[in-house]
Amino acid sequence: MLVIVGESASGKSTLQNMFINANPQYKKVITYTTRPMRKNEKNGADYHFVSVQEFESMIANNAFVEYTEYRGWYYGTAKADCNGENLVAVLTPSGLRALKRYGINTISVYLRFDRRSRLIKILQRGDEIDEAYRRNLSDYGQFNGVENEVDYIINNYDYTHDPQQVLEMLSLAITAEGKKNGI
């Protein structure tokens, strides 16, 4: 499974969608959340948006490889969605660690993006300024040291790489890992 990690508004989901569009044999892992949908999000495409009661029932039934509560909302990756080949997931560092503990073979990429540009993107997508600052600070702690946990790092400060270049980097990473692991 290709796992893309990166702070809020670093371009993870955009990169995931671009990669899948360029490589249709890959399938998006759609995670679950109890948070409200943002404008332009679609249930079953961006997330599985479920109620707290549904999510807690899934926890009780051991349906998740990993889940977390973040600012009052649940987020999680279902075990059933991690079966198969050619999967691409967008996760937090703790989500990546959980997949590895569960025994899922991963190729992990950290999409590094500068704080100022991320803050601007968060505000542009309509988040409140207090929420934007809070997310930026939270990411700082959560992603501290992630460079040592991933297989590859893509520095994408100020969009210096064009999308095609980033896709090529991902493809090279997958090819290299496949050869290394006999895939």
Task: State each model region's role.
Residues 4:
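Hydrophobic anchor at the beta1->P-loop junction of P-loop NTPases
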Residues 33-87:
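ATP-dependent small-molecule kinase phosphotransfer cores
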Residues 88-92, 101-123:
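Conserved phosphate-donor/acceptor-positioning beta-strand/loop module used by diverse small-molecule
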Residues 21-29:
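Post-Walker A helix-loop "phosphate-sensing" segment adjacent to the P-loop in P-loop NTPases
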Residues 12-13:
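Walker A/P-loop
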Residues 7:
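P-loop (Walker A) phosphate-binding loop of NTP-binding proteins
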Residues 127-183:
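Small-molecule kinase domains that catalyze NTP-dependent phosphoryl transfer to phosphate-bearing small molecules
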